[in-house]
Amino acid sequence: MTTLTKIQVYPQVLEHRLFFRDPIRVGSRLTCRERSNRVYVHRCEKKVERKRKVEKFKGNGSWDSLKSGFLGFSKLGFLSKDEYNQKVENLEMVFSSVAVQIARYIVTMTSTGAILLIGFQLSGGDSSMNSLVWYSWLGGIIIGTMTGANMVLEDHYRAGPRNVVITGSTRGLGKALAREFLLSGDRVIVTSRSSESVDMTVKELEQNLKEIMSNASESARKKLSDAKVVGIACDVCKPEDVEKLSNFAVKELGSINIWINNAGTNKGFRPLLEFTEEDITQIVSTNLIGSILCTRGAMDVMSRQHSGGHIFNMDGAGSGGSSTPLTAVYGSTKCGLRQFHGSIVKESQKTNVGLHTASPGMVLTELLLSGSSIKNKQMFNIICELPETVARTLVPRMRVVKGSGKAVNYLTPPRILLAIVTSWLRRGRWFDDQGRALYAAEADRLRNWAENRTRLSLTDAMEMYTENTWVSVFSLSVVCAFIILQSTTPSSFPGT
């Protein structure tokens, strides 16, 4: 039918049908139906629906009023119900993110403002001291903001699921790392010598993922939608098994972003003469030769990838070259692995493959506890942690690592200092005076694992503050200490 004319009719005024005897074409926002020589023009249902959606948010507080205003000036009202709900959810996430950032900077200004007032009070009105306080505050804000911005950019740059391979990941720390990567939305391959152990671990991790997703919010489920876990049996001491693992990873995941050489073994705490030849061979083969073979296999795959990748070798007792009595063989493998790591980092400088170390510290695993004495276990109460705790700290740092030659450590100086200061309170934390375990088995711990993930630790609470808060508070505290020392004269001390 030929278009004779175009008309514009506002749907709000169409309380009754309008009839046109001449053939016409009506705008796309009107619903039309032609019968012989007539066109029936109805009210635009989409615009009516849009108006209804906007009205729904009115009168329900400032938050809903803000959404109402946004909807009124947008085209969200013309979307389908599902599209509309998705857009509104995204809008709420944006508003929430903005509100969080505003709250963080309010905390920054409040925290540093309190220190600022203390500094002015201590300066006694001295203009030079006041200037020093101001410059210290401003410098802290600038440096902290730059640091925070860099961290945000790094996190944004590395956003999205990773493809991760973890050797020795059917128990202990390896399984905890696999679980943490999986629940970060990543695709994970677990390995072990035993195919039965691999199958059991895959089923267990899949069940963990289902339980988390069943109770997660819509945004969390979207984040976990790409998560996947598969497994394959692999003896890292055998080159053919390592090659099979790398080929399997490429087939299942398409590429490898992170490869963690976690497979390791120890045969207890005892003098060298009590180790059998088989014990020595197995320790050296697994800890040193296995890590070298896996590093070579991972580098071969990653060097052919446009995005490259990152390889982590696990540090342990003896990595720094210190003596390790009663674990001489284990310590020598870790020391040798550190030498290998330093060499391979220099070899790969012109490639897109990053080589790093990860140090979990002392973790309550079978590897650590094998052959340990009661005295050892009393020490473990102070500095040891559960695998889940360590994995929760290491994985976020592994996911955003850049460059090469980085060290991702759990036992940082602040954590060591905190452990020493609170050592009295940590007595009997994991073992009693007789060396009997007081902590729950892994299966029991994981029943409440999802709930425990949401609880804030001291370090988690510290990380909620922006970087410029900590830098500013530190710099201002140093200035305040300087002012106090400057204002203290020798005559203030008795006997001088």
From Swiss-Prot:
> Mind telling me where the transit peptide is?
1-43
Quote the Gene3D superfamilies the UniProt record gives.
NAD(P)-binding Rossmann-like Domain
Keyword Membrane applies: yes
What's in the GO CC field? chloroplast; chloroplast thylakoid membrane
Q: What is the top-level taxon of the source organism?
A: Eukaryota
Q: What is its EC number?
A: 1.1.1.294
Q: What reactions does this protein catalyze? A: 7(1)-hydroxychlorophyllide a + NAD(+) = chlorophyllide b + NADH + H(+); 7(1)-hydroxychlorophyllide a + NADP(+) = chlorophyllide b + NADPH + H(+)
Effects seen without this gene: Decrease in chlorophyll b during dark incubation substantially suppressed.
Broadest EC class?
oxidoreductase
Pfam families in the cross-refs:
adh_short (PF00106)
Membrane spanning residue stretches: 105-125, 132-152, 470-490
Which residues are named in the active-site annotation? 330
Establish whether keyword Aminoacyl-tRNA synthetase is in the entry: no
Q: Which InterPro entries match?
A: Chl_b_Red (IPR052625), NAD(P)-bd_dom_sf (IPR036291), SDR_fam (IPR002347)
Which spans of this chain does the record mark as coiled coil?
Answer: 195-224
Q: Where does NAD(+) bind?
A: 166-190
BP GO annotations: chlorophyll catabolic process; PSII associated light-harvesting complex II catabolic process
Arranged from A to Z, the UniProt key words for this protein are: Chlorophyll catabolism, Chloroplast, Coiled coil, Membrane, NAD, Oxidoreductase, Plastid, Thylakoid, Transit peptide, Transmembrane, Transmembrane helix
Instruction: List localization entries.
Output: Plastid, Chloroplast thylakoid membrane
What membrane topology does the annotation report for this chain?
Multi-pass membrane protein
The Swiss-Prot or TrEMBL record annotates one GO molecular function as: chlorophyll(ide) b reductase activity
* Self-association state and partner proteins as the record states: Interacts with NOL to form a complex that acts as a chlorophyll b reductase. Interacts with HCAR, RCCR, SGR1 and the LHCII complex. Part of a SGR1-CCE-LHCII complex, which acts in chlorophyll breakdown.
Q: What's this protein's family per the entry?
A: Belongs to the short-chain dehydrogenases/reductases (SDR) family.
Q: What does this protein do?
A: Involved in chlorophyll b degradation. Belongs to the chlorophyll catabolic enzymes (CCEs).
This chain belongs to the protein called: Probable chlorophyll(ide) b reductase NYC1, chloroplastic
- Which organism is this protein's natural source? Arabidopsis thaliana (Mouse-ear cress)
